[in-house]
């Protein structure tokens, strides 16, 4: 298994950040445009909740569309939420989205634990 960690400082209060990142309708806004991200199970709720299923299509490689389904497995208001892949390209995908107050704004951390397909050949 592998892990990626990203963090960024956002110069606004934690409430603004939480309200933005916990609204699944904003996923397209925060996904790089080259991915061709499109939610396919609309209409979708305005706030993420544990048990929420989000189905979407992306075109990450050679413009080949790929279906992906994630479940929001944990939500702690104003702190974090976790999405886990249910259908998609990885053997395992566990993505934590964490926020915390810091001086001058909010620290947002993404922690992605994943296992590529095809064992050692999928690296």
Where are each of the predicted segments found?
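Hydrophobic pocket/interface hotspot
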Residues: 16-21, 27, 54-56, 72, ...
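Short, surface-exposed coil-to-beta transition loops
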Residues: 3-5, 65-69, 91-96
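Generic structural detector for well-ordered beta-strands
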Residues: 5-11, 38, 57, 71, ...
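Beta-strand/loop substructures that line and gate deep hydrophobic ligand-binding cavities in soluble
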Residues: 85-123
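Glycine-rich portal/gate segments that line the openings of hydrophobic small-molecule binding cavities
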Residues: 39-87, 104
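Phosphate-binding glycine-rich loops and adjacent basic patches that engage nucleotide phosphates
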Residues: 14-15, 31-35, 56-62, 97-109
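Hydrophobic ligand-binding cavity/cleft-lining segments
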Residues: 1-49
């Amino acid at each position: 298994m592998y892990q990626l960690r990203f963090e960024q400082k956002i110069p606004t209060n934690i409430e603004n950040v939480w309200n933005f990142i916990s609204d699944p309708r904003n996923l397209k806004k925060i996904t790089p445009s080259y991915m061709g991200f499109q939610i396919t199970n609309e209409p979708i709720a305005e706030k993420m909740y544990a048990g929420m299923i989000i189905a979407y299509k992306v075109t990450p490689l050679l413009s080949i569309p790929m279906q992906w389904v994630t479940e929001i497995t944990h939500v702690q208001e104003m702190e974090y939420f976790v999405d886990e892949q249910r259908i998609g390209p990885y053997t395992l995908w566990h993505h934590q989205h964490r926020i915390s107050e810091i001086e001058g704004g909010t620290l947002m951390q993404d922690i992605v634990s994943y296992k590529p397909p095809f064992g050692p050949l999928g690296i």
